[in-house]
Amino acid sequence: MTGCVNSISPPPVTLYRHRASPSRSSFSLSGDALHSLYRHRRVSRSPSIIAPKFQIVAAEKSEPLKIMISGAPASGKGTQCELITHKYGLVHISAGDLLRAEIASGSENGRRAKEHMEKGQLVPDEIVVMMVKDRLSQTDSEQKGWLLDGYPRSASQATALKGFGFQPDLFIVLEVPEEILIERVVGRRLDPVTGKIYHLKYSPPETEEIAVRLTQRFDDTEEKAKLRLKTHNQNVSDVLSMYDDITIKIEGNRSKEEVFAQIDSSLSELLQERNTAPSSLLS
């Protein structure tokens, strides 16, 4: 899932940014000022080239990246998160994985979470918010930066995270047609030994030995997928309104390399703007 191509010319990224001028009459070199500068500058996108081998990119003399990625079930978030974390060294935090681990533990919260997930409903905030908060607060997340996958899924969850002081630098949205999403979900399989995700059609297992041990997640049936999509569609606009000035929308119905090229272009430019911001402010 970390494959790449030599050269990709990505399609234009639809970028949504707040155009109002900063309210402050002057800037300092604080984190708030740098974040404000990024949010209010006009951004131009240029094609990104994916090298044959990724190298970790560090943001010198700046705060670590804080990224959120959102999309409907099977929109490709997991694949893109692997590519992003491999290149940028961020800590990948999947709300779904946190919930599934809680369910596997047999705890009361896990039992309650499973009941809601089986119905295609959002897990109550009081269960999941603290799980995500605790993971974001761990040392590795604070030092390396984080990539929050599939969360927040409602305006109330976004508000709770903001109240705890967690604000992303960029909010990435993957958009894929619904019929393709259903096909992706139903054909998805999990290797319980390695944790790797396969797809019976698009990414089949390498050997028969792996094929016979694959399992389907309990929430990956067509019926539950449709319920989850309905819930996602009902909540996504409210979430986007919380991050409209830092949101980029990516067409996810492309090859993983093409999708990553668009994301990589945005992240690389964000790092470049951060690293050049001090000299710009002093000039």
Swiss-Prot record:
Residues 187-220 are annotated as: LID. Disruption phenotype: Seedling lethality when homozygous, due to loss of chloroplast integrity, causing a bleached phenotype from early embryo to seedling development. Residues 94-123 are annotated as: NMP. ATP binds at A74, S75, G76, K77, G78, T79, R188. Keywords: ATP-binding, Chloroplast, Kinase, Nucleotide-binding, Plastid, Transferase, Transit peptide. The keyword Kinase applies. It is an enzyme of class 2 (transferase). GO terms for cellular component: chloroplast; chloroplast stroma; plastid. GO terms for molecular function: adenylate kinase activity; ATP binding. It holds the Pfam family ADK. Its EC number is 2.7.4.3. Disulfide bonds: none annotated. CDD domains: ADK. Residues 1-59 form a transit peptide. Gene3D superfamilies: P-loop containing nucleotide triphosphate hydrolases. It catalyses: AMP + ATP = 2 ADP. AMP binds at R100, Q121, L122, V123, G150, Y151, P152, R153, Q157, R217, R228. GO terms for biological process: energy homeostasis. Monomer. NCBIfam families: adk. HAMAP family: Adenylate_kinase_Adk. Catalyzes the reversible transfer of the terminal phosphate group between ATP and AMP. Plays an important role in cellular energy homeostasis and in adenine nucleotide metabolism. Plays a major role in the equilibration of adenylates and de novo synthesis of ADP in the plastid stroma. PANTHER family: NUCLEOTIDE KINASE. This is Adenylate kinase 2, chloroplastic.
